[in-house]
Amino acid sequence: MRSVLICGGGVAACCCAHLLRRAGTHSIVEKVDRPRLPAIMLGQTTQKIFEDIFERGDLFEAGHRIQRRVVAWVEGREPVSLPHSAVVLSEEALLDRVEVGPAPNIEDMPGEPEWRIITSHSSAASSAEHHFGGRMAAASPVKLAPAARADSCWIESLPSGWLFLLPCGTDRGWLLAVGGPAQSLLAESHLVVDQLAELGRASGEFPSHPRITDPLGGPGWLRCGSAALGFDPLCGDGVGHAAREAILGSAVIRSVADGGDVDSLIHHYQAGLMAGFRRHLGVCSGFYRAGRRGPWWDEQVNDTLRGLEWTSQRLQTVDAPRYRLKGFALEALG
């Protein structure tokens, strides 16, 4: 295969480019400017995925460590403190660590690319999207209270939304407010509010409900990352999903280059992403059911149930898998 053009510039784009270059495929990233996430928390499983993709065990050595998770979720129950193991860093810092060497220029591409991988939501304007919810979120910089433990994170449900406080240093962090402005939600808070000394200005709102693009691929193109799926930050698995999508997408393109059937490989890719999206909706449904009762919470549950019904209908038409991942490559079954 001569070349692959990757339209994006985030985590999925970097993972796709690296995996394809490792396999000897000429890939070029056409970056799309978009705001970077100020803080992301990666659990041990996601850290291991990145270490395997980029063949580096030192990617997260300098990250801020989270060792405890304090949860006030079920109405009427006391907060629960649970052990945790995660690392916090900004999206920009993560990309700086995984982007090794200067990226090839698009002018260096030998003719038209044989495949395009679209990884940026802003570059997927012609796609049809299915949204399961309408909740908005906003992230605000904060200064932690002196008594707040910087190795902990906090999540709290409230009558019309929820708060997540994530330290990213000894005395600073980010507050994610979902369902309403941070100040309004903090006025009802009994847990998160006590961990704050100062609340900064939010950088703007963004959708926080699950969404999926349809179709996810066709001959000569695939959608990956935010151009394919959108995840609820409640589950904290968006970055890990982006890396997994990149693994599967790059494996599909490699299989096509080796003579595999294009239609069946694209079908496998779409089925894999659809199944992962359904699992995410199931987790969301469990979390929102376990939270509070009231109009806002009932709406979130109904939205996730609608998504589960839609994905069930779509997956009913999916054939049995014809491939499986072995490492970073697909192998045919049977």
Model-derived segments and spans:
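Glycine-rich FAD pyrophosphate-binding loop
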Residues: 7-9, 18-40
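Predominantly flavin-linked oxidoreductase catalytic cores and closely associated redox partners
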Residues: 9, 100-201, 210-213
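Conserved N-terminal helical subregion
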Residues: 45-141
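C-terminal helical "tail/cap" subdomain of flavin- and related membrane-associated enzymes
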Residues: 254-334
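FAD/FMN-dependent oxidoreductases across multiple families
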Residues: 181-267
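Hydrophobic "anchor" residues on beta-strands that sit immediately upstream
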Residues: 4, 26, 114-116, 222
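Short, well-ordered alpha-helices that flank and scaffold nucleotide-derived cofactor binding pockets
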Residues: 18, 22, 100, 155, ...
